[in-house]
Amino acid sequence: GDILAARDTITCGGRYMNDNVKDTARSIMNDLGAADNAQNRDCAAYAADRLTGRVCASDRDDLKLAIENMTGGANTVLYDNAGRPSIMCAIPTMTMDDLYGNGDPSVHPAWVVDGDVKKVIYISKYMNVIEDGRAYSLPMRSAATYNTFEDCVNACLRKGKGWHLFTNAEWMAVAQWSKRNGTRPHGNTGDGCYHRATYERGLPATMFCRRAHLVKTGSGPVTWNHNHNASGIADLVGLMFEWVGGLRLMDGVFQIIPHNDAALYDENLLKIDSRRWRAVTTDGYLAAHGELNTLKVDGTVPGDALEEDHLLGRPVVSTELNNRSYLGAHTDGNQGYLDCQFCDLKAADGMEIPELAKILG
């Protein structure tokens, strides 16, 4: 009885322990495990597994079934190569007609990975935390911040095959679904609340100048989810800046990784010299870097060589780069920048934006 009580106490308190205390607890459990009594050994193994983040098969099944039952299968639990859980949203295959109502029966690129059409894609329900170098989708946490693109890519890849940074194709599919279904998500866009409805608040995770800065993942109302339902993807709007894979600007040129191939398990996939990057031409075809008539971001006014943060003007989508923002020598410092809301981004006179570019943002 005393051993069982100790097991439960250590198990329940494991998440609150620092590493030194956890090491001590593991040592105690190891000592117990050396005892002849089989019950002692079982208790020691159980507690040690829970302390190190592993979950036995029955616990895994219970957690997975509970989450799926509560959400009607819209959410599930997936485990990584360390045996640790993430709560995920299961998004079944959607066609272009499903998302745009255009009569096109072809599958949206987000469900096409290396030529294979997926029946479902899994997207983190919560902004991720990073623990032991791996990213996890968990509720009521302070999400990871101040990480480079490479940090975030690697935190996903370390979890094993199938795990990847949220791709641009996936992001655009979710955003379009919300738009079409009238559930554009709200979020933490102003000191812990939604700026257009300040009564919508999340639970503070960090404070700045006595005001909530970040909020705990998933702590906002259901309107902060992509479907305005408890089963939805939380915090897509506000909270923090997010990285996505498969879209970049290279020397002013829009480049994508076709379909949802940015989800492939490949440590070199998203690197600067990856051969999978493609530009988009004005007629909607994919092209190698340097080819003519590809989409670019140009300025509306001439740039300068000032190494300081300052607004130059608005960007415009063009096939030419006539007004580069920065004209000085290479620097990692601040430079002039172009700015406008995405919905206000225009194409140069006489130019049409191809559908592929619209679909992938």
Residue ranges: model-predicted function:
Residues 7, 18-31, 40-51:
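Amphipathic alpha-helical segments in structured regions that serve as interaction surfaces
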Residues 32-33, 49, 172, 197-214, ...:
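C-terminal, surface-exposed recognition/capping segments
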Residues 32-33, 49-77:
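Charged, compositionally biased non-catalytic regions
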Residues 67, 75-162, 251-313, 324:
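Extracellular adhesion/carbohydrate-recognition regions
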Residues 107-236, 265-267:
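Short aromatic-cysteine micro-motif
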Residues 179-185, 248, 255-259:
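Short secondary-structure boundary/capping segments
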